[in-house]
Amino acid sequence: MLEEEYTLDYFRSEGFERKVCKSCGAAFWTRDPEQEFCGDAPCVTYNFIGNPVFKPHNVSEMREAFLSFFERHGHTRLERYPVAARWRDDIYLTIASIADFQPFVTSGVVPPPANPLTISQPCIRLNDLDSVGRSGRHLTLFEMMAHHAFNTPEEQIYWKDQTVALCDEFIKSIGGDPARVSYKEHPWYGGGNAGASVEVLIGGLEVATLVFMNLGRQKTDQPPVDVNGVPYYPMRLNIVDTGYGLERLVWASKGSPTIYDAVFPEMVSRLMRSARLEDLLDNPEFTKIMGLSARFAGVMDISGTNLYNLRRKVAEAIDVPVERLERIVVPIEKVYSIADHTRCLAYMLGDCIVPSNVREGYLARLVLRRTLRMMNDLSMDDALTDLIEAQMQVVGAENFEQDVDAVREIVENEEARYASTLERGARIVQKIARNYRAKSSRVPLEEVITLYDSHGIPPEMVKEVAAAEGAVVEIPDNFYSLIAETHSEAQKEARGEDPLDAYRERAVSLPPTKKLYYELPNEVEFEAMVLDYFDGMAVLDQTLFYPEGGGQPSDTGTLVTSESMVRVEEVVKLGEVILHRVTGGPLMRGDRVKGMVDEERRWSLMRHHTATHVLLHAAQQVLGVHVHQAGAQKGSEVSRLDIRHYRHITPDELRRIELEANRLVMADTPVYIHVEERTKAEQKYGFGLYQGGVPPGREIRTVQVGADVQACAGTHVRTTGEIGPIRVLGVEHIQDGVERLVFAAGIAAVHAVQHLGDLLQESADMVSVQPENLPATVARFFSEWKEQKKEIERLQKKVVDLEMQNLDGEVVDGVRVVVRTLDATHKELVALATTVADEGGVALFASSDGTVKVVATSGAPTVNAVDIVREVCGILGGKGGGKPNLAQGAGPDASRLEEALEYGRNRIIEALHGE
């Protein structure tokens, strides 16, 4: 990026010089004329360890110092956003403070919530997960303290000079010496934007980055700027995007050996006691080694590195044998990681992320299980639930949406799942390891990743179990980082060929369709003009027909002209133009038409859509605030609502959800629909608005049903009373962490109840009792059936015993061989054949009731029952399989049964003779 981007009046007036680092070659600005290095690791080592560069601050003190400083300088303080980025459809977790305002504020679609503003935003980045605890500086969750200004041609807030001046002044306000600060030039790009930036360095540590975002990928009439080989174009907005690392500032203010000692002093001490490592804290050698190790490890890149080689370099640098270094630091690294991970989990679960196998839930489970593994390695006394609760209390439990008790239940549920995974995982890995060992090949990394993604089996367990089976597995030191990186961004669903694509160009040339279904949602008749007609698609100037969208099917109905009538089968939206797929005859441009919407279907869809909102609210009331919509599909007869929940919904909870929903219906609460500016709606209602996805645009349409408010484009009833009864027909566990509620509303619910009543009456009639007596009668019948089943089994055993007395067979080389056709059930065939094999013999039995069933058993090592059954069934036109001692099969050709059994007998005799 051009030098003039960084040649600031402030740098000139304050006596800065621009230099080039002798180590990395990057340009930087400094007040020190003798400085030769940029001041960033690895060009220099950390020199603040044991030598703090700021006045001592804990986390709360440093956060308040920053926010109040910028408030004094005209910035509005904002409350933090959730760590679950529910206002974004491209990422799952909040990764930076600027992510709070992407994409709509940064693109200029909506105004910022304040301008200028300051915020301390908890962020989660898992791309360096394996470095946490090892490097002394990496965290999964960190607070990015920031001040942002959004400059437009009409309103200039401030730009580069004032941003750097504010940075200098803030550093001075917390006891730092601005003369020790270097500003390193570093062009920034990401998320489709770019700009000049400077890294703020002091004591060898980067404590902040000041980004001046003024470029975007969107092509404009301005000449492009090359950033890392990619053309970017000047934006209308010039955005000050700063990020100050709260934890790094605290670390530099304390000069502790690691960032973990500075940020989590009480938690680290607690974990050391829990792991029975507290004696190390009083060991001078330990303190020395940890301090030196942190100082030197800090200048090395942990990610993707061979960890042993890195430790060897650190050991050489501090003159300690590498084995001794590992014995000391590995348990402590796990303590540090647990301290970090439990705080990360406190935010994840406290902000209502539900652990699962998908989306942000996958990432929460990844961190949670990694924490459990390390706690198991250290045989810790503390429970994970207690540690996460302690971290929530440090932050302030009132700052989380989810309550502590629910978080504890979620964690306990996950611990039980993890234990179950470990129990069954060993068997799965053993089978795979034996397979690769037999092929004399290593277990590939792809297999290890699949085992983790599909079964939740940790790589450490894979390596351990595989080694016991004689198979080799190599796990990269950054395994968890690789896994997290592949799951951190939302994957765009693969889209097949859209049949509407052929019409896009034509639709763009047409005026927007007036949406009468919003203005007059309860009307079913309207008049309009045909603007275009092609391929059975009619475009009107206005319409009452609702197009498919948001999980709601389209309206259907008719269009009538003076000469003809056509049927509207489907309605779709293409941009701002609505297309009606019609059958029954062509329409002409300019035709006046009368549209008639199928009233019963329209009302049923409206009832079901509003009922979806009601049911979601009821589920949150019963199950907890963590419940979020994972999907929905409305129908005119039956609808479904998928919700995120950490365990199966019980029958009692299902009844309570249904009752809660119907109470809201009976309250006959008005349904309020408004079009609101996005920023104001988010501030008023929170990000629970986006249950059904994130709509584009400056304004969003909000639908309020009781206490539930969502951004929604669907059609709705006027009051909850118009929904009519809501009947939950069932619940399905469709995937880990997602439950599906199947329901009906209005007349459809009445039909569903009537159908269930009919089934009940039919069942009662079948046993000649009144419906109210059916449960007791069924219980009695079931009890009698169980007794009769026992008696049948007793008699069957007696039959088998009697049959056995008549199955003499023949003896071949001392082995009893019985080959016979029997009039017996399949179960009886197996029982008889097994009895022969248990006595060391060989049996081949068949029965025929149209299809021939074949069973073979072998108690002789030279006779393989599978081979016999496959060949016999092959003659019968079928196939079979099983194990060497018991095999089963079938074939349709009963006419060749005698031939097949004779062939089988001969094969058995040959095997016994060793032929």
Curated annotation (Swiss-Prot):
UniProt-annotated location(s): Cytoplasm
Enzyme class: ligase
Cited SUPFAM superfamilies: Class II aaRS and biotin synthetases, Putative anticodon-binding domain of alanyl-tRNA synthetase (AlaRS), ThrRS/AlaRS common domain, Translation proteins
GO biological process per UniProt: alanyl-tRNA aminoacylation
Binding sites annotated in the UniProt record for Zn(2+): 609, 613, 712, 716
UniProt keyword Protein biosynthesis, yes or no: yes
Keyword Endoplasmic reticulum (UniProt): no
Alphabetized CDD domains for the sequence: AlaRS_core
One annotated GO molecular function: ATP binding
Source organism, top-level taxon: Archaea
UniProt keyword annotations, A-Z: Aminoacyl-tRNA synthetase, ATP-binding, Cytoplasm, Ligase, Metal-binding, Nucleotide-binding, Protein biosynthesis, RNA-binding, tRNA-binding, Zinc
Enzyme Commission code(s) on record: 6.1.1.7
Cited Gene3D superfamilies: 2.40.30.130, 3.10.310.40, 3.30.54.20, 6.10.250.550, Bira Bifunctional Protein, Domain 2, Threonyl-trna Synthetase, Chain A, domain 2
Cofactor binding: number and manner: Binds 1 zinc ion per subunit.
NCBIfam families: A-tRNA_syn_arch, alaS
Known role: Catalyzes the attachment of alanine to tRNA(Ala) in a two-step reaction: alanine is first activated by ATP to form Ala-AMP and then transferred to the acceptor end of tRNA(Ala). Also edits incorrectly charged Ser-tRNA(Ala) and Gly-tRNA(Ala) via its editing domain.
Domain remark in the UniProt entry: Consists of three domains; the N-terminal catalytic domain, the editing domain and the C-terminal C-Ala domain. The editing domain removes incorrectly charged amino acids, while the C-Ala domain, along with tRNA(Ala), serves as a bridge to cooperatively bring together the editing and aminoacylation centers thus stimulating deacylation of misacylated tRNAs.
Annotated family: Belongs to the class-II aminoacyl-tRNA synthetase family.
Name of this protein: Alanine--tRNA ligase
Native species: Methanoculleus marisnigri (strain ATCC 35101 / DSM 1498 / JR1)
Name of the coding gene: alaS
